[in-house]
Amino acid sequence: MSGTSLDGLDLVCVDFKKKKNWDFEILKAKTYSYSSEWKTCLSELHLQNSQQIKEVEKDYVNLLAKFILDFKSDIEGIDFVSSHGHTVFHQPDQGFTLQIGNTPQLSKLIALPLICDFRSQDVELGGQGAPLVPIGDLHLFKSYSCCLNLGGFANVSLPQKAQVTAFDICAVNIVLNVLANEEGLEYDSEGNLARAGHLIPELLSALENLEYYQKKAPKSLGIEWVNEKIFPLLDQYRTNLVEDRIHTYTYHIAKQIGSIFKNTDSVLITGGGAKNNYLISLLNKFSKVKFSIPDPLVVDFKEALIFAFLGLLRIENQVNCLSSVTGASADHSSGNIFYP
């Protein structure tokens, strides 16, 4: 799994079992960090033309293969590799989404079956192509009322009687990391930078009034929306201290998320944002529900874990995309399967 916050490539080896319900055990997990050159390349890829993207994809597939081969060197009995790829474009309302790395060549290089490209079919069926994690939340984390992931974006899975509703709430680390970069930091460790700042009321008001927050689910966000809506607003306040801007944006995140959880009992929090102590303290301020943070492996690797599960469902031809979540015309089993 390669996320929008560009931390690197998350790999997990998971053992799934099913008796009455699905269960899992993470046998091995590791994040392979991107070099500064790859971070720059991937962050700017949406600005390139189709030929340039194809050329980068060839190199990216080789990079994926290198990481996967290293990761699996001491593992036996692997059934398949399930890969999300790295998102370049995600504009489902325009009818397209693109993740690079989803090629038959990767299967050949790693000498294993590959399940990939989980989003395209959903978009073709009129869906948002996101979020896809809720099917995993439904089967693997049944003991929680809902699941909140704080990654590049905040997304949530909410059970609604016989079906699941899920959507992207707001941008999180994809914005916070950029602000932290201004201080020479990769990210705002434990939210300390935000904690030291002060609220900019005018900026908060402008953020709260963005049209996306008035839309009803299904809905999803991409980097294009952040570049078009969030960064221009933040740029208007560049004369303010970065501590004040990151404080205000963190406050905004907590307000948006807090408004979702008025009637839920227990919320599982995963993703890098679960380590942002200041953000978590604000969430507790804006919502009275019980937030639970699981063991570090699940916090860091839940998305990779669930994309492995999506691959398992796909190879067994079971539903792995829920129309109640994405808005597609029907539930379906999504993903391309390639063999070496």
Please place each PLM-identified region on the residue numbering.
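Short beta-strand-loop/turn "lid" adjacent to the catalytic site in phosphate-handling enzymes
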Residues: 49-103
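Glycine-rich phosphate-binding loops at beta-strand->alpha-helix junctions
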Residues: 88, 265-283
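Conserved non-catalytic scaffold segment of RNase H-like nuclease domains
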Residues: 22-59
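Extended, folded domain segments that form the structural surfaces/walls around functional sites
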Residues: 187-195, 254-255, 276-289
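Conserved phosphate-binding/catalytic loops in two-lobed NTP-binding clefts
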Residues: 285-306
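Phosphate-binding/catalytic loop of phosphoryl-transfer enzymes
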Residues: 92-97, 104, 108, 112-187
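Conserved ATP-utilizing enzyme core subdomain
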Residues: 4, 8-32, 162-254, 316-317, ...
